[in-house]
C-alpha cells in the first residue's frame, strides 16, 4: 500500500484538497459499471495484473433509488464480493461516482438525496471524516498525487453529477425512428453556452488542479470526453465545457494529460489532436459487469471497441530516460484487446 503523506486535511497549516502519496505507481488499472447483484469474475484477472492503484470511475453500484437504506445495502453487497475484497487488500482504491451510484439514471443537480448519497458513498470508500469531500457545496471532486518531480502522477477526479444542468432530449418518435437505428441516444447538445456540467466553483478548482505538479496528469471522468456526440451522456452534450477544458490545457501549458472514463458499457480508445499542441488520449473502460452490443459511432476511436466486460490500464516504464506509456483495454480473462504505446515526451510540448 502507498504511504499517505496528507489526505484532504492540514499539512503545514495549509488546507489540502487532494491526497499526496510518496511513491509513484507504474501500473494504474481502472474500470466502471459494476452491478452489485452480478458475479464479478473480472476481478480475478485484475488482481493477477497486480495494479498498484485501481480507479473506480462511477456506477460502482447501481443504486437508482431515493431510499438511502436500500443504497447502503447495495454498497454492502459490493463490499462483500470476494473479488472486490481481494482487490482492496492488494491495491490503493480511489473512486468517483456517476449517475447510478449518485442515485438515479442520468441524474444531475436536481437529484433530491445527493447529500445523503454523498455520505454513504464516502463512508463506503473510507473517506476520512474531516475530508473536504464530505462538506463541499459543489460535489465530491478530488485529486491524488503520487510521487514527485520527474516521476509523478496527478490523478484528477471531477464530479460530473452534483452541479450538472438538465439535458434536452428529442421526442420518443424521433429517438425510435432516427437515433436508435444509428446506435445513438436521445440527448441534444447545449449550443447556447449557458448550461454547465460541473459549475463555476468546480471550474475554479479544476483550473488550479491543472497547474499543480505532476508530470502525468490523469483526468478520471465518469463520462466520455473526447468521443463524438453520440446522443448519450458525455461531455459532448456540453460543448462549451469541453472546449473550456481544452483551452485551459493550452492556456496553462499543461503537459502530460491523459484521460480515462467509463459509463458506456463498452470499451474503446480515442485519440484527439484538433487545435491542440499535443494529442490527447482517452481510454474508456466499461463495464466491469455491464455490456452493450450497440456501440455508438466515434470518429476519434483508434483500434476496435470491446462490447464485453473489460478493464483499462495505464502503465508507465519509469526506467526509461524518456518514460514509455502503455494504454490498454483487457477482457475478462486478462487478454489485451486494444493497446497503444508511446513516449511521454510526445505529451510534453511545453518547457
Indicate residue ranges for each PLM-predicted region.
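Bacterial N-terminal signal peptides that target proteins for export
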Residues: 1-9
Amino acid at each position: 500500500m502507498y504511504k499517505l503523506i496528507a489526505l484532504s486535511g492540514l499539512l503545514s497549516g495549509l488546507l489540502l484538497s487532494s491526497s499526496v502519496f510518496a511513491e509513484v505507481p507504474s501500473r494504474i488499472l481502472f474500470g466502471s459499471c459494476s452491478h452489485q447483484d452480478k458475479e464479478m469474475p473480472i476481478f480475478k484477472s485484475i488482481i493477477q495484473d497486480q495494479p498498484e492503484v485501481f480507479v473506480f470511475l462511477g456506477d460502482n453500484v447501481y443504486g437508482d433509488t431515493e431510499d438511502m437504506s436500500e443504497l447502503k445495502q447495495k454498497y454492502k453487497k459490493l463490499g462483500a464480493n470476494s473479488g472486490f475484497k481481494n482487490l482492496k487488500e492488494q491495491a490503493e482504491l480511489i473512486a468517483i461516482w456517476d449517475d447510478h451510484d449518485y442515485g438515479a439514471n442520468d441524474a444531475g443537480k436536481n437529484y433530491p438525496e445527493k447529500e445523503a448519497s454523498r455520505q454513504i458513498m464516502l463512508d463506503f470508500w473510507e473517506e476520512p471524516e474531516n475530508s473536504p469531500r464530505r462538506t463541499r457545496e459543489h460535489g465530491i471532486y478530488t485529486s491524488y498525487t503520487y510521487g514527485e518531480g520527474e516521476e509523478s502522477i496527478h490523478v484528477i477526479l471531477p464530479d460530473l453529477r452534483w452541479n450538472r444542468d438538465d439535458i434536452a432530449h428529442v421526442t420518443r418518435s424521433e429517438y425510435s425512428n432516427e437515433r436508435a437505428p444509428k446506435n445513438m441516444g436521445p440527448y441534444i447538445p447545449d449550443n447556447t453556452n449557458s448550461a454547465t456540467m460541473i459549475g463555476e466553483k468546480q471550474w475554479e478548482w479544476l483550473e488550479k488542479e491543472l497547474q499543480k505538479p505532476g508530470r502525468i496528469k490523469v483526468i478520471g471522468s465518469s463520462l466520455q470526453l473526447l468521443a463524438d456526440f453520440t446522443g448519450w451522456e458525455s461531455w459532448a452534450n456540453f460543448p462549451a465545457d469541453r472546449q473550456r477544458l481544452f483551452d485551459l490545457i493550452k492556456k496553462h501549458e499543461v503537459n502530460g494529460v491523459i484521460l480515462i472514463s467509463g459509463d458506456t458499457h463498452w470499451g474503446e480508445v480515442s485519440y484527439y489532436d484538433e487545435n491542440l499542441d499535443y494529442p490527447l488520449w482517452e481510454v474508456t473502460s466499461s463495464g466491469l459487469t455491464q455490456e452493450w452490443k450497440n456501440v455508438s459511432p466515434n470518429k476519434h476511436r483508434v483500434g476496435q471497441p470491446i462490447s464485453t466486460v473489460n478493464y483499462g490500464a495505464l502503465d508507465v516504464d519509469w526506467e526509461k530516460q524518456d518514460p514509455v506509456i502503455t494504454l490498454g483495454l483487457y477482457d475478462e480473462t486478462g487478454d489485451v484487446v486494444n493497446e497503444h504505446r508511446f513516449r511521454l515526451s510526445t505529451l510534453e510540448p511545453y518547457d
